[in-house]
Each structure stands twice: as C-alpha cells, then as structure tokens.
C-alpha cells in the first residue's frame, strides 16, 4: 500500500503515473478502499476536471512537496476546470480538506511500498 502524509495524517493512495492514468483519474469510479489518488507529473501548469466523475472530490495541487492550491468540494461532472501549478495533484473525497484542515503551505510526503515502485 502507498501513502501520503500531510501533517500527522496518513492517507492511503493510488499513484497515477502515466498519461492514460492521468486522463482516467476518478472518471466513473468511487473511492473503493483508498483515501486519495496521487498524480505524479512534470512540474508545470495543469488543469483537472470532474467530467464523467460520479463522486464529489477535493483537488489539491502540490509542488516541491508543499501544497500550493486547494479546491474543496468539486462537483462531479460539472464541466469546470481546476487549474494550478505543481508536480503532483492529489484528489480526496469531498470534505477531506475541511475535516483534516489541509491548507496551502503544508508538507506532503509520499511513501511508496517497495513492491509498488
């Protein structure tokens, strides 16, 4: 199992590395046993959307291990784009950022189980 750690909270995560995985994201999926989805990408401006998603989510942009932008409670299938700069994006079930007080400036640590690298 892979995890991300923000503050003192550990979240199980599914790591998305390929362009195909990035394009699929949470489309047509539920959280089904994971706390988050971690998108590892080249640091630059990225745009995420919730088209074809069936669950609301929080979208968090991360750069150099720090949270730089937070979009809480993104409506599924809204057609809206969520833009930010970063080398990673983390998607959480809606209200996670409020429940765990996740804000810009916090450190994000990715822990990968050796069998999943």
Predicted segments — roles?
Residues 1-117:
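Compact, glycine-rich, soluble single-domain proteins
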């Amino acid at each position: 199992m892979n995890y991300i750690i923000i503050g003192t909270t550990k979240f199980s995560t599914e790591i998305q590395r390929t362009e195909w995985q990035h394009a699929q994201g949470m489309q047509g999926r539920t959280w089904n046993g994971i706390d988050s989805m971690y998108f590892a990408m080249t640091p630059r401006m990225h745009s995420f959307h919730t088209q074809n998603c069936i669950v609301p989510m929080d979208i968090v942009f991360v750069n150099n291990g720090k949270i730089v932008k937070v979009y809480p409670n993104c409506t599924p299938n809204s057609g809206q784009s969520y833009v930010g700069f970063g080398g990673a994006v983390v998607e959480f079930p809606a209200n996670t950022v409020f429940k765990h007080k996740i804000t810009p400036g916090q450190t994000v640590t990715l822990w990968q189980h050796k069998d999943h690298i």
